[in-house]
């Protein structure tokens, strides 16, 4: 008996619907191993770098109007980057109440420098800058609830 694409599609569909975490299928020279990621949160998380968070990208067609051309006398454009939250949680600007805040407007940040903490499920996750630059705006207040992907700070690069 040959395994067809249809058989594989049916199998993958069943695995998605059921509570199957691991599946190993071996037939002659064909071998398939499926491992679903666990939905459990690791208990020993201390620091989470936002560079390790991946977002799914949906393909869409977007019509973007052409940019207006700038005159020669206009100011050169400034580059900005945004530090975003890699998770849902509570934003804190200092390691503990009453302690010195990590960064404030006007501070120069370096790559991998801790800029804030996001508390998620009673775990304090240090959020680090992925770029160097000057903090020009902090977009959330201490104690605010933030969503995954929400902008936290604006950095001039």
Curated annotation (Swiss-Prot):
A molecular function GO annotation: acetyl-CoA carboxylase activity
Pathway(s) it belongs to: Lipid metabolism; fatty acid biosynthesis
Gene Ontology cellular component terms for the protein in this record: acetyl-CoA carboxylase complex; chloroplast
GO biological process: fatty acid biosynthetic process
Every Biotinyl-binding domain range: 80-156
PTM annotation (N6-biotinyllysine): residues: 122
Alphabetically ordered keywords of this record: Biotin, Chloroplast, Fatty acid biosynthesis, Fatty acid metabolism, Lipid biosynthesis, Lipid metabolism, Plastid
Source superkingdom: Eukaryota
Subcellular localization, as worded in the UniProt entry: Plastid, Chloroplast
Gene3D superfamilies: 2.40.50.100
Broad class of where this protein is predominantly found: plastid
Keyword Calcium: no
InterPro entries on file: AcCoA_biotinCC, Biotin_BS, Biotin_Carboxyl_Carrier/Decarb, Biotin_lipoyl, Single_hybrid_motif
Protein biosynthesis found in the keyword field: no
Cited function: This protein is a component of the acetyl coenzyme A carboxylase complex; first, biotin carboxylase catalyzes the carboxylation of the carrier protein and then the transcarboxylase transfers the carboxyl group to form malonyl-CoA.
Protein known as: Biotin carboxyl carrier protein of acetyl-CoA carboxylase
Native species: Porphyra purpurea (Red seaweed)
């Amino acid at each position: 008996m040959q395994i067809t694409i249809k058989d594989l599609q049916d199998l993958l569909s069943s695995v998605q619907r059921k509570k199957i975490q691991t599946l190993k299928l071996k037939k002659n020279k064909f071998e398939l191993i499926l491992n679903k990621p666990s939905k459990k949160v690791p208990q020993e998380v201390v620091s989470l770098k936002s560079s390790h968070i991946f977002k799914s990208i949906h393909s869409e067609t977007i019509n973007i109007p052409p940019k207006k051309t700038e005159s020669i006398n206009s100011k050169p454009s400034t580059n900005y980057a945004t530090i975003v939250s890699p998770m849902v949680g509570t934003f804190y600007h200092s390691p503990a109440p009453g302690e010195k805040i990590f960064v404030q407007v006007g501070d120069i940040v370096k790559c991998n420098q801790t800029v804030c903490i996001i508390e998620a499920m009673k775990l304090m996750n240090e959020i680090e800058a992925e770029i160097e630059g000057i903090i020009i705006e902090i977009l959330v207040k201490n104690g605010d609830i933030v969503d995954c992907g929400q902008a936290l700070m604006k950095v001039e690069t």
